[in-house]
């Protein structure tokens, strides 16, 4: 069947900012799809609000709009561009919901826009819980006993019929937003009211819990001729009850009999045929472990997290082929790009095992509720490939970067067995490691199976890992056992620990005895056809399939799993670096382990090694490939942390030298450099003990900022005001980084400025300066950044330029550097310097059209910036105003305080661009999910130090016509200035403010932190209540003031004559 010729222009909707439940997998899918459509000759228009993606690069589509993903903005683009068709199935839940809204409002019909891919009716049948249930009943496919409710009362009626436990699933949401498992009336009331709030259709499905069943997924493809195949089937190690995004997953499934496998396969294909899906689709099923009974849980009629995993697990490019199916091509006429000889209608087969483990943010949010359920909490994931299940699991564990390298906890031996069992009884992110500890203590697999419902197959594999540990301990120095342990994925570090040796001893022993891994190809067909892909994994076998060429090579380290503080921005830089390396004529090799990203698409680099980012795993690749050098500055802290270790093996680190990287990180050396080049910094000291920290703080004067050295994303960083707070911090934070001391700095309140620059050692190019809306003290990743700066004097800009050039030259930077400054009372001070690619590189690259990561890579390879055509200093400004606004995922993380401070908390970002600051801010806030209303009620409760400042904001909001509520102290201050205000009661009292928020009477909350136990708890409760009820809460007065500017620009002033 030829492709459709009745359409020329296609609008593709992206998925927007990275949030929990919707991460980098959609950048990968969207990029693939746009390129596939262009390949077929269509004109592609893309709209997405996330600047940190490869997808929003100009080369990916014919026209790129970085605009908020709301009905109104997309409608404007449709009216302006007049596309013939809209492809919504590659933009996650956001894309689907937009398609439904644009259809319902009549915009698509009025502009003659057709929907491509899966029909709208099918999307609604899969997403609307009522319609889906009806269809399943018609097909005789069992679904769990359930009911659709639109009110809390209806939920209680259903509970009377079936009893607890119950699972609540809101309609039209992703990542299980608002859903959960309920065991009692209180939980049912909370979860259902939450779920109705988050569901655009105010609809929840309530079903009898089948927790304990096996959860199986099939990733399927279908075209318009009804050809349908299974691309990959996957098994969740965790039984039903934990969201698949939070489950440990293995592919292919390990515990299904052939009868079970074929039965579930047939059902999956039957369902997507009945739904009429064209493209990729994910089917989730629950199988009773003791019979052939099964239920269908849900169907995602779109490309998803699971399809990104399935693509990387099999090498089969689902998103690319789904896009081509959407324009009418069929599976039997498209070649499989991996083999280049077989067709896309062949089902992939695997001769290896894949393990995926989610990456959770609890190392950042130690107080967050860790218990896992049907609402997703992971920010990202890692994948590993091995020849045995044990090997793939252990490789995945050491890819997580939790400081855990094995099936156990770093201080596991210190726990009591009772505590270990108690932790296993709760489903949380550490359960796997506690199971390892329990097996070490001799707990029977039967007991573990009864507690967890994890299949005996997996428990036996865990047991095998522990058995090998014992064998190692009993056979110290025995090469046979060393080889055996390597076959099952043990790292040198773990073997060294069992043999009471150093990791390097084991490495040297392996080298001397030639015990090295070989690299196998991922080819979709278990080596049945000749394959051309350069996609490899390491394993301890005999034949090496990775053929080393005689071309000069450069190895780029990726940034691993997505987590808070290290997002898709680093993947963006990695991909651009690879393109620059290829353009310069070198062979580009990537090492990375994140299945969601563009960098792990085999078509990006000349060779892709899907391996853990550890010293051992990277050295094994270097020993084989012998690259000219390794690039670490694009892979975030993950890659930087490996530089030292690789250099000790004699590996050449390209770009800024290791000495200079360390000079930027080492406090004393950095201070010496600043004195030498005369760049001021806030007064600061280094402390290695609580006593020393107190002496330092008293000498400098409070408030001080305290943080461990060598961390990313402001981990364990705090602003403290007195001795007591400092003592509390020191007893908890010193463990944050034992080999490295704690830094104590004077805390300067002032404007925070961020600068990214590129240097070749001679010329320093500054693409732009960004000014933060929030004053210093809020982490740069959580601040709203504005380009070009709006309130700086020319003198200040000249000073910033001068200091940036001095720092880049003083540190001998080759490549990228990111600097944060503060402008306080009497001048410009440097806060910190990062000699690497930063979070703002994609944002600035998009604005200025200077491909910063590529330019940096060219400088690293020896080109001079002057030859390329750049002059030193700040580059000419782009027209317009650009805003980078942070996006948070607090609604998915219970018990996490949303107050902004020096620890980073946002998971993603959006860009707003327009001709004025207010319009750009409006777009940034709207794109980040903040509904800006020109009237309503604002609730204010601020700390004493902020009371003077809140008066101005209250006055302006009152002028616009906002109604003001305030707690007693704040209200008194406003009354003193003749601002009309209504006093609300304290928590727990009459007419308390939480009830007001819960009843939907408040549109905005402004709440700043007051220290002190009781008040802090109240403040925390207020902030969490706003999150649970979807009310915007501002914890910084600078953000509140900026929002007030936006509202003022939307309204007319009303004053009597």
Swiss-Prot record:
GO terms for biological process: 'de novo' UMP biosynthetic process; glutamine metabolic process; L-arginine biosynthetic process. Its cofactor is Mg(2+); Mn(2+). It is an enzyme of class 6 (ligase). Pathway: Amino-acid biosynthesis; L-arginine biosynthesis; carbamoyl phosphate from bicarbonate: step 1/1; Pyrimidine metabolism; UMP biosynthesis via de novo pathway; (S)-dihydroorotate from bicarbonate: step 1/3. Mg(2+) 2 binds at residues 298, 300. Mg(2+) 1 binds at residues 284, 298. GO terms for cellular component: cytoplasm. It catalyses: hydrogencarbonate + L-glutamine + 2 ATP + H2O = carbamoyl phosphate + L-glutamate + 2 ADP + phosphate + 2 H(+). GO terms for molecular function: ATP binding; carbamoyl-phosphate synthase (ammonia) activity; carbamoyl-phosphate synthase (glutamine-hydrolyzing) activity; metal ion binding. ATP 1 binds at residues 129, 169, 175-176, 208, 210, 215, 241-243, 284, 298. ATP 2 binds at residues 707, 746, 748, 752, 777-780, 820, 832. Mg(2+) 3 binds at residues 820, 832. Mn(2+) 2 binds at residues 298, 300. Residues 1-401 are annotated as: Carboxyphosphate synthetic domain. Residues 402-546 are annotated as: Oligomerization domain. Keywords: Amino-acid biosynthesis, Arginine biosynthesis, ATP-binding, Ligase, Magnesium, Manganese, Metal-binding, Nucleotide-binding, Pyrimidine biosynthesis, Repeat. Its EC number is 6.3.4.16, 6.3.5.5. Residues 930-1057 form the MGS-like domain. This is Carbamoyl phosphate synthase large chain. Mg(2+) 4 binds at residues 832, 834. Residues 547-929 are annotated as: Carbamoyl phosphate synthetic domain. Mn(2+) 3 binds at residues 820, 832. The keyword Ligase applies.
């Amino acid at each position: 069947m030829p492709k459709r010729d009745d359409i020329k222009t296609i609008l593709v909707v992206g998925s927007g900012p990275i949030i929990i439940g919707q991460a980098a997998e959609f950048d990968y899918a969207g990029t693939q799809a746009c390129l596939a459509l262009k390949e077929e000759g269509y004109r592609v228009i893309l709209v997405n609000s996330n600047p940190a993606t490869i997808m929003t690069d100009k080369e990916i589509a014919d026209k790129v709009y970085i605009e908020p993903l709301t009905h109104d903005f997309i409608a404007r683009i449709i009216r302006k561009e007049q596309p013939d068709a809209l492809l919504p199935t590659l933009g996650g839940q956001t894309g689907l919901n937009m398609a439904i809204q644009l259809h319902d409002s009549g915009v698509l019909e009025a502009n003659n826009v057709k929907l491509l891919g899966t029909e709208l009716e099918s999307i609604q049948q899969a997403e609307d819980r009522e319609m889906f249930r009806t269809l399943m009943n018609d097909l005789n496919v069992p679904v769990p006993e359930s009911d659709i409710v639109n009110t809390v009362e209806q939920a209680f009626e259903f509970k009377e019929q079936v009893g607890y436990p119950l699972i609540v699933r809101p309609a039209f949401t992703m990542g299980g937003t608002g859903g959960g498992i309920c065991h009692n009336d209180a939980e049912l009331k909370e979860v259902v009211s939450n779920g109705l709030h988050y569901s655009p259709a105010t609809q929840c499905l309530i079903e009898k819990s089948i927790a304990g069943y096996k959860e199986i997924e099939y990733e399927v493809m279908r075209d318009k001729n009804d050809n349908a195949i299974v691309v990959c089937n996957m098994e969740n190690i965790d039984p039903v009850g934990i969201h698949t995004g939070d489950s440990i997953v293995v592919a292919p499934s390990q515990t299904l009999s052939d009868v079970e496998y074929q039965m579930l396969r047939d059902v999956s294909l039957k369902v997507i045929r009945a739904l009429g899906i064209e493209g990729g689709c994910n089917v989730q099923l629950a199988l009773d472990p003791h019979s052939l009974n099964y239920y269908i849980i849900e169907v995602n009629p779109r490309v998803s997290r699971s399809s990104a995993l399935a693509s990387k697990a099999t090498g089969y490019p689902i998103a690319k082929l789904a896009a081509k199916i959407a324009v009418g091509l069929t599976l039997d006429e498209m070649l499989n790009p991996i083999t280049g000889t077989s067709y896309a209608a062949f089902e992939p087969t695997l001769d290896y095992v894949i393990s995926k483990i989610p990456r959770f943010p609890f190392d950042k949010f130690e107080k967050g509720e860790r218990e896992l359920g049907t609402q997703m909490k992971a920010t990202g994931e890692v994948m590993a490939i091995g020849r045995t299940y044990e090997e793939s699991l252990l490789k995945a564990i050491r890819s997580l970067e939790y400081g855990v390298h094995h099936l156990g906890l770093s201080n596991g031996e210190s726990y009591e067995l009772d505590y270990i069992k108690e932790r296993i009884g709760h489903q949380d992110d550490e359960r796997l490691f506690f199971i390892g500890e329990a097996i070490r203590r001799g707990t029977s697999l039967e007991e573990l199976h009864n507690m967890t419902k994890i299949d005996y197959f997996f428990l036996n594999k865990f047991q095998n890992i522990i058995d090998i540990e014992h064998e190692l301990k009993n056979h110290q120095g025995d090469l046979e056992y060393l080889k055996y342990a390597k076959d099952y994925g043990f790292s040198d570090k773990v073997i060294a620990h069992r043999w009471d040796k150093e990791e390097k001893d084991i490495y040297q022993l392996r080298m001397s005895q030639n015990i090295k891994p070989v690299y196998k190809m991922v080819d979709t067909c278990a080596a049945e056809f000749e394959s051309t892909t350069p996609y490899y994994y390491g394993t301890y076998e005999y034949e090496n399939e990775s053929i080393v060429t005689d071309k000069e090579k450069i190895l780029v380290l990726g940034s691993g799993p997505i987590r808070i503080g290290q997002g898709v921005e680093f993947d963006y830089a990695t991909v651009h670096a690879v393109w620059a390396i290829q353009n310069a004529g070198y062979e580009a090799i990537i090492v990375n382990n994140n299945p969601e990203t563009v960098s792990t698409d085999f078509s990006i680099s000349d060779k892709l090694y899907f391996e853990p980012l550890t010293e051992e795993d990277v050295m094994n690749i270097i020993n084989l490939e012998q690259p000219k050098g390794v690039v670490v500055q694009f892979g975030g802290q993950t890659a930087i942390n490996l530089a030292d270790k690789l250099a000790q093996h004699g590996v050449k680190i390209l770009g800024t030298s290791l000495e200079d990287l360390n000079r930027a990180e080492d406090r004393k050396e950095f201070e010496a450099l600043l004195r030498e080049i005369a760049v001021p910094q806030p007064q600061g000291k280094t402390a290695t003990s609580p006593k020393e920290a107190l002496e330092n703080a008293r000498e400098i004067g409070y408030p001080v900022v305290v943080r461990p050295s060598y961390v990313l994303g402001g981990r364990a960083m705090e602003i403290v005001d007195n001795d007591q707070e400092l003592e509390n911090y020191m007893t908890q934070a010193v463990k944050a980084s034992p080999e490295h001391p704690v830094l104590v700095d004077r805390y300067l309140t002032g404007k925070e400025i961020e600068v990214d620059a590129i240097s070749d050692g001679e010329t320093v190019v500054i693409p732009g300066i960004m000014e933060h809306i929030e004053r210093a003290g809020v982490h740069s990743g959580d601040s709203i950044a504005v380009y070009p700066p709006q309130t700086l004097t020319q003198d200040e800009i000249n000073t910033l330029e001068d200091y940036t050039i001095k720092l880049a030259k003083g540190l001998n930077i080759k490549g990228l550097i990111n600097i944060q400054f503060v402008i306080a009372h009497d001048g410009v001070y440097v806060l910190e310097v990062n000699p690497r690619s930063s979070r703002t590189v994609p944002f600035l690259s998009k604005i200025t059209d200077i491909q910063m990561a590529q330019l940096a890579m060219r400088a690293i390879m020896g080109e001079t910036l002057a030859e390329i055509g750049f002059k030193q200093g700040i580059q000419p400004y782009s027209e317009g105003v650009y805003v980078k606004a942070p996006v948070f995922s607090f609604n998915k993380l219970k018990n996490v305080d949303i107050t902004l401070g020096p620890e980073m908390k946002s998971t993603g970002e959006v860009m707003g661009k327009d001709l004025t600051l207010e319009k750009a801010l409006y777009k940034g806030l709207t794109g980040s999910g903040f509904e800006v209303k020109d009237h309503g009620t604002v609730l204010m409760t601020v700390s004493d130090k902020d009371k003077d400042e809140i008066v101005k904001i209250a006055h302006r909001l009152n002028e616009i016509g906002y109604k003001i509520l305030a707690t007693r102290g704040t209200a008194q201050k406003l009354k003193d200035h003749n601002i009309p205000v209504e006093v609300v009661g304290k928590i727990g009292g009459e007419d308390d403010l939480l009830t007001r928020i819960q009843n939907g009477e408040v549109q905005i909350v402004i709440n700043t932190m007051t220290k002190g136990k009781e008040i802090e708890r109240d403040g925390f409760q207020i902030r969490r209540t706003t999150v649970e009820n979807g009310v915007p809460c501002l914890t910084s007065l600078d953000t509140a003031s900026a929002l007030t500017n936006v509202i003022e620009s939307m309204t007319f002033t009303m004053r009597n004559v």
